[in-house]
Regions:
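Short beta-strand segments enriched for Tyr within beta-sheet-rich domains
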Residues: 123-128
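Extended, polar beta-sheet/loop recognition surfaces of beta-rich domains
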Residues: 138-196
């Protein structure tokens, strides 16, 4: 079985300082609020990333409109579980650390290129969910959505430190992210409902947040870190003054 190993690296970004640099070039610079003091949400104390192996019932390129990923049945393979989770906790004086008992890596497969009745249905693909918890242990995802917070929050996913597994070979384009992973935002409104249940619409294309996404892996025999950045801006994601490099 041709597999990849994916670890998670975390980064939380506040947009104010970055945007201050941008605004300093304008004739009449705007002085933003200190977003560190006025985030309008709690700081997370725990984060869980859940990866669910799926197959498709729709064209990959239509997922953000119609949905389509369906969970695969469980596998007896030791490392190839259909549902995998990695959990980090914020430790005093140490920052984000792997939670006790959490797995440290995701084991994933390169997708095969398949077509079903003319539709592009690569498999496997993986649904990726992110859950945040406050210091009390309460789920706090809604705090990044409600009261307009969805307009200034977005996750970004970047593979880094790519290297071959013990049985793989380095390739010239290993460090080109688009050659390694393909990610689509499939956030929903409401955020905690699904299109399959007919209780929500998929809005990840128009309002990408990254609490829900679908990812596929384009190479095999690779090991890498998936850097996850949660960006908190002081202006809407759709504002042209938002720094483009932070939206990649």
């Amino acid at each position: 079985m041709k597999t990849n190993v994916c670890k998670i690296a975390l980064m939380f970004l506040i947009g104010t300082a970055l945007s201050l640099l941008f605004n300093s070039c304008s004739k009449d610079p705007v002085i933003p609020e200190n977003e560190t003091d006025n985030k309008l949400h709690e700081d997370p104390s725990k984060m869980t990333i859940r990866l669910v192996e799926c197959h498709l019932h729709a064209d990959w390129n239509e997922i953000q409109k119609v949905g389509g990923p369906h969970q695969n049945p469980e596998s007896p393979a030791k490392h190839m579980k259909r549902i995998q989770e990695i959990t980090y906790e914020l430790k005093a004086g140490k920052g984000w650390r792997l939670a006790e008992g959490s797995q440290s890596k995701f084991y994933v497969q390169k997708n095969g290129d398949y077509y079903t009745y003319g539709k592009y249905t690569p498999a496997p693909v993986y649904l990726m969910f992110i859950y945040y918890y406050n210091a009390k242990g309460d789920l706090m995802n809604s705090q990044f959505i409600e009261n307009g917070q969805d307009n200034i929050h977005q996750h970004f996913f970047t593979p880094e430190n790519v290297k071959p597994t013990f049985d793989g070979q380095p390739e010239a384009d290993d460090n080109e992210p688009q050659k390694l992973v393909d990610y689509l935002y499939v956030d929903t409104t409401p955020w905690d409902k699904t299109k399959h249940s007919k209780e929500a619409e998929i809005t990840g294309d128009s309002n990408p947040i990254g609490l829900k996404g679908v990812i596929r892996f384009l190479k095999d025999r690779k090991e890498f870190d998936l850097k996850i950045r949660l960006y908190h801006g002081y202006k809407s994601k759709g504002n042209p003054e938002t720094r483009s490099e932070e939206r990649r």
